[in-house]
Amino acid sequence: MTITSILQKMVKLKIITSSNFYLSTMLFNKNTLATFLSICVNHFTNHGHVCLPHVLIQHQKIFFTNHIALITKLWEIAKINTCGWIEQLLNSNTISNGSKNTPFIFYKNNFYINKFWLAEQKILKFISQKQNFKLINKNKIQKILKNIFNTNIDDTQKLAIILSIINNITFIIGGPGTGKTTIILKILLVLIRLHKKKINIKLTALTGKAANRLSESIHENIKKLNLTEHEKNIFNQKTTTLHNLLDLKPNKSFNYSCCKNKLYNLNLLIIDEASMIDITIMDKLISSIPKTTKIIFLGDYNQLPSISGGNILKNICSYYQEGFSTTTNKFLKQLFPNRITIKTIKKHQFSNINDKIIMLKKSYRFKKKSDIFKISEMLTKNKINNIKTLYQNINNDVNFKQISSKTNYNNIIFEITNSYSKYWSALKQSLPFLKIINIFNNYKILCILKNGLFGITELNLAIEKEMKKIGWIKKVTIINGQTWYFGKPILILKNNEEMNLFNGECGLTLLDANKKLKVFFLPKNQEQIYSIPIHLVPEHQTNWTMTVHKSQGSEFSEVVLILPTIMTSILTKELIYTAVTRSKKKLTIYSDENIFIKSLKKNIIRYSGLSIHQKIKF
C-alpha cells in the first residue's frame, strides 16, 4: 500500500478533499513525508485553522473519522512514529523555521502554510507597535473632551474614547447594547475638532447590512449633536464594506499598489463587526493602510468568527488584562487626573497589545432582569448549568419550546408563520415602504442549516404553504424558474456593484405605481428608496427564514431560533450566542433540550500562533 492509494481512499470516503489530494501529490509526489504534511496542514487550514500544532500529528488527531485502521496505516507509511521525522523535514526544501522561503514553516511547535505564517507575523508586529505619546497635544485634547464628557457616558466608555484618540490602533470590544456606536460618534467628533483641516475618514463593516446599520445609527444620533456645517459634511459620508474599501472581489487578484494609492491620505478607518475579519483580509489591510492611519476595530469576539481562516479578534483579545501599563496609565491620568479610575498592570509582557484593548461590559439595551441578557452573560462566562435552569422555566422575554415529532413540526410552522400577521396587515393597509420593512425586520426566524427539515429551504417552503392556506399569498408568478408573489421577502446572496446591491441586503416584493411587481430595498447612506423589476434581481433566496451566519451585523426586536434535531458540526456556543444577541426584546428557541445543551458545551476551536495561549484539544 502506498501513500497515494491511501489518500485516494480518503478522497472517496470524503475524509479529505480532491483538491487537497491533487495539490499535495503533484507538489511532493517523490517525498512521502512532505506529501503527508501537506495533506494534514491543508486539511486543517480548510477547516479555518491558521496552523497545525505538531502534537496533534503525534497523537493522530487530524482526521476525525471512524476509519481508524486507514488513518493508522497512513501514519505508518509516513513513518511519523519514528524519531527525527521533523528534523528530516527541516533538512529538506519542504519546510523551514522561517529563515528561508519554503512551502511550509515549522515555528513554535506549529506547522504553517508559508503565507499564513507570514501573515501572522505581520499581524503580531502590527498590533505590538509602540505608541509615541510625545506627538499628542494634551491641552487641546483636554479642552475638547471637557465638552464631550459632560454627556451621560460611563468611565469605561470615556477610556475607550481617550484610547482611540491617543492610540493609532484601538480594539473596542463589547456585546450588544454596550454603546459602541455612541462611542464612535464621540470619537469622530473629537478627531474632527482636533484636525483644523478636513479629516479623511472611512466607516466600514464586514457586511453590507452592518455597514448600512452603522450609517443609520450615526445619522440618527448626529441630530442630537450641536455640529457646524463643516462637521455635518464630514459625518454625512457613505459607509462601505471592508471588502469594497480594499477592492477584494471573488476571482480577482489583490492589487496592493492600487489599494495603497487609493488609501494613501486616509486619516481614520473604523471597522465594525471586526470579529468577522479573517487572517487574509487582516494581512491585506495592514499592507494597504498608511502607517499614520488611525484604525479603530469594533466587535464582539464571543460571536461567530469569519467563515475563512482564523479567529483574529479573539486571538488579539487573549492578551487583555483589565488595566494599562504604567506608561499609558500615567498619560491617561495626565489627561484626566482624579476623574477616571484606572488600574495599573505591572510587568505585562505584552503591554503594547493590552494597552490597545478596552472591554465594554455594561449593557444599555437590556435590563439586568432581561433573560436575553442573562443568557448572553451565561454564555460568555460559560455558566452552562445556569442556562439549563433557565431552559426549564417560563420567562417573559425568552421562551424555550421542545421539538419532538413530525406533528410537532407542523405546529411549529403554524406558530412561526402566524407571527408574520403584523407584516401582512401592514401590506393590506398599504403603509409606506419604510414602515412596512421596519415591521418585517422586527421579527426574524433564524436557523443554522441550508437543507433538511429545519434548514432555510424547507422552512421557507413550509411557511409559504401555510401562508397560502391562510390566504396571505394569493397570485403567484413564475419568472425564470423563480416563484414571485406580492409580499415575498428576499435576501441578496452576492455583491452586485452595478445594481448597488450587496450580500445580506433584504428586499420586499411590492407593487409599483403601475401595479407591477418590483423588489424594493432600503435606502443606503441617506439615498432614496430604490426598486428593481423582479426579472432583474441578482442571486437571492426567499427570506422568511435566514441562517444565523447571514444574520450577523443585524438586530431584530423578536427572534425565533430553530435548531435541528440532530447534532451537527456547526452547532456551537458561538453560534447560539450570535443568534441570542440578534434579539432586542423577545427570543423563542425551538430545540431538543439535549441538542441545545450539547451545543452550549461545544466551542469553536481555531489553532493559531497569534493567541497568547493556545489550548490543544484532543
From Swiss-Prot:
Q: Which family does it belong to?
A: Belongs to the RecD family.
Quote the subunit structure annotation: Heterotrimer of RecB, RecC and RecD. All subunits contribute to DNA-binding.
Q: Where does ATP bind?
A: 174-181
Q: Enumerate the UniProt keywords alphabetically.
A: ATP-binding, DNA damage, DNA repair, DNA-binding, Exonuclease, Helicase, Hydrolase, Isomerase, Nuclease, Nucleotide-binding
Q: Which GO terms describe its molecular function?
A: 5'-3' DNA helicase activity; ATP binding; ATP hydrolysis activity; DNA binding; exodeoxyribonuclease V activity
Instruction: Reproduce the miscellaneous comment text.
Output: In the RecBCD complex, RecB has a slow 3'-5' helicase, an exonuclease activity and loads RecA onto ssDNA, RecD has a fast 5'-3' helicase activity, while RecC stimulates the ATPase and processivity of the RecB helicase and contributes to recognition of the Chi site.
GO BP:
double-strand break repair via homologous recombination
Annotated GO CC locations: exodeoxyribonuclease V complex
- Name the species this protein comes from: Buchnera aphidicola subsp. Baizongia pistaciae (strain Bp)
Q: Which Pfam families match?
A: AAA_19, RecD_N, UvrD_C_2
Q: Which PANTHER family match?
A: DNA HELICASE B, DNA2/NAM7 HELICASE FAMILY MEMBER
Question: By its UniProt entry, which SUPFAM superfamilies does this protein fall under?
Answer: P-loop containing nucleoside triphosphate hydrolases
Reactions catalysed according to its record: Couples ATP hydrolysis with the unwinding of duplex DNA at the replication fork by translocating in the 5'-3' direction. This creates two antiparallel DNA single strands (ssDNA). The leading ssDNA polymer is the template for DNA polymerase III holoenzyme which synthesizes a continuous strand; ATP + H2O = ADP + phosphate + H(+)
Name the record gives this protein: RecBCD enzyme subunit RecD
InterPro entries xrefs? Coronavir_polyprotein_1ab (IPR050534), P-loop_NTPase (IPR027417), RecD (IPR006344), RecD_N (IPR049550), RecD_N_sf (IPR041851), UvrD-like_helicase_C (IPR027785)
The enzyme's E.C. designation:
5.6.2.3
Is DNA-binding one of the keywords UniProt gives this record?
A: yes
Q: What does this protein do?
A: A helicase/nuclease that prepares dsDNA breaks (DSB) for recombinational DNA repair. Binds to DSBs and unwinds DNA via a highly rapid and processive ATP-dependent bidirectional helicase activity. Unwinds dsDNA until it encounters a Chi (crossover hotspot instigator) sequence from the 3' direction. Cuts ssDNA a few nucleotides 3' to the Chi site. The properties and activities of the enzyme are changed at Chi. The Chi-altered holoenzyme produces a long 3'-ssDNA overhang and facilitates RecA-binding to the ssDNA for homologous DNA recombination and repair.
Which domain of life does the protein's organism represent? Answer: Bacteria
